[in-house]
């Protein structure tokens, strides 16, 4: 395996040496000799790689070759950079002062000659220990295996291919959670690769489970979890999104109290995926109260994690797949059938395939990975070779994994890595940077790969970095080595992660190759992958980092800080100490996002990192960017979205970075900052471009742009904007914010003629959409704000047949009527309408928006009624806020047979009476009525809302009476009902009620007598003024004596 990785490095060095001849004037002889030596060296790699396991000396030779290649890249690249700098006119004095600016040809001749001498020595050493030379004709050749693997066509992955032989298991687990009231904790245990997480996901997403529980939470626990993080994740999942910031600021004690109260008063399912030790469960467990509304589903390799000798704990051990199911799963992946009727498998392949899957032992992960490998191999010869390799691995018994039970699976997973092309090996090893269960941002990952030189020139030359990254991720996904799915709206891989066992392979291979070193603040001694200094260093969850004291390797190529997303929500940051980067001058990648810098100033020595390709300062606390940043001419990624309250000073040096592909500018650079960006013609992403600091003319040449966010000032005309961006025909995402839009009353609009555009956000004055002014037909997401459209936009927008999400935000439409025509919006799934001050009438024709599932209308105060008919029948969630509907909306809404969640909030209905007819709302699960100031009477007829399990009524000051019924109701909260005086609970009403909370209802004198017949009630919260009468010996104690938990506030 090291042979291919080294071959990859030799190829990169060869490419450097094969640049323009004039660059190497004065050292031509040394360069020619080095190329010849590299060619000779490559001929020994295959045999050296095979013998390194049996000879320590050969292994040391292989390590020395890696160092030679790294040093060669550093030497040659530095020479080329200095040559180019020497040719540049007008070089700043500060750059001249750098020791490396004036090329010393004699010094480099000696350096390159030294590389040749080291290669000659290592070849002699290998030959003396029997390493054989292979014949290589001509110049450096890429390994043939890489070429063959790249030429093979790609196949799309069948999303259902993993789900074989699990149906009975899912049914049994759902039964434990839904039907068996005494079961509290269900654990799925077994060896790695058995499909425990896949099984848990199927259960988690099961319709019966969603219907049974009010709240669902999924937490990946992993080995290095903290109790605080797990508790925060659970509470965030169970609470509204608006409360995330508040949750992240809670102390551990407050978190525990909130979770106990919540789990006492609601039915929740918590999935804890990948718990390693019994002690981990004991740490998490204190949030679960003795009441039984909650349930836990956990997965673990350790059967003892949640074992208890009582019936409330169930341990479920899935069986390995049968031979028949194993073959079915294997066929779906390795031999996808285009036409099952005509498909006939090659007999030899069938025999070899069935032989190989025996080695997988019925483990789904091993079968999927084996299938992914063989899907890439067409000939029976390839299949036979792989079958022999698997057999030799098993017979040889060589492994570094600890768990003997998993050896079979680990052999197959390890072999899947060995079968990768060399460039994909690097891509896969790079994933070792990230913690367990980390959702890796594929776009950022693509730029890491590009900055490290992992992209192959034939893939990278002229291509968009994001596109190449997507191709590489797709190849790893297709081989079942990485888990990811394409986003519905963007059609891209947005995030990816590793299966826990595949991550073990990744960490093991990274350790074997000394690929990187990991240091984590969560461990007392760090988690170093190698005692040997690595060229890559990653800090996970740092608190402080001193670049002068903590980093000792001047040859370091990559320094990355990694933290989970939840840390960002909690305002996490860390302190970067040390003022000099001088000792790190060979860095290619520097990611110090969220760093606090002393005095808010980035050290000027950053400019000496002339090899740097990737610099991430996102959300770092920086107020000044030094002029020396202009020295970083090789940068392809620069993120300056700084986290400071005021403006950030950015000198006019970005124009020097002509290799930039990604640039995110600070949101506020002050009026004095003026940037020239016309040289940055390779940009693919440009964010926070403002005409206050930049010229629109500079955009004309950026024809490679895919993502652009732009802010206009009042002195900028829309004609100028249109002329500047009109040629950016490859744009996929565009955001325009016009801060001077109301000054442009006489200007024409913009024609958005971008055929590849998928996401468009417009925050600008645009009163008319002319016939010529159309939107791109491939749009999937559209946000409009401050447009003040005078005419109904729906006739134009509904013709966007790919549109999946539409938001009409504040002041986007100033007219009174909107009409959604029959057949319009065929793919729209989510519609949000907010802040339309003049909108009064909404008509929806039959068959409009046929797949719409979410509707949110807020702050549309003149909208008096919903469409009488033809609201999309597939709606599952509706939220109305401050709409002032005059007519009762229930007769319209109750006909929506798929509706599961309904919120009528803050004056969304101004009438006195609401009536829910019998048989209405057949699937409604949750209903919230809040701040309906005029509501006096709410009538619910028998048979209405038969599935309702959560009802919340708040701040309805005139409501005097509550309806009866609700046969499935489990949670009821009544808050600030000022006129509510009497409550009658009839016999048989609310037979499943579990939690009841009554707050601030001053006229209600006592609890209803019928409450004593609701034996399912477990939690009751009532006013403190009732404490005496409800306590033991009190006059109403008989009403509550059967309730386990009664709280008084």
UniProtKB/Swiss-Prot annotation:
Residues where ATP binds: 190-197
CDD domains for this protein: RX-CC_like
Residues annotated as domain NB-ARC: 147-460
Coiled coil: 25-41
Annotated InterPro entries: Apaf_helical, LRR_dom_sf, LRR_R13L4/SHOC2-like, NB-ARC, P-loop_NTPase, RX-like_CC, Rx_N, WH-like_DNA-bd_sf
Region Disordered: start-end pairs: 139-158
One function term, GO molecular function aspect: ADP binding
Keyword annotations: ATP-binding, Coiled coil, Leucine-rich repeat, Nucleotide-binding, Plant defense, Repeat
Domain of life: Eukaryota
LRR repeats mapped onto the chain: 584-608, 609-634, 657-682, 683-707, 776-799, 800-827, 849-873, 896-923, 945-968, 990-1015
Listed GO biological process terms: defense response to other organism
Compositional bias of kind Basic and acidic residues: 144-158
Description of its domains: The LRR repeats probably act as specificity determinant of pathogen recognition.
Its biological purpose: Potential disease resistance protein.
UniProt similarity note: Belongs to the disease resistance NB-LRR family.
Record-given protein name: Probable disease resistance protein RF9
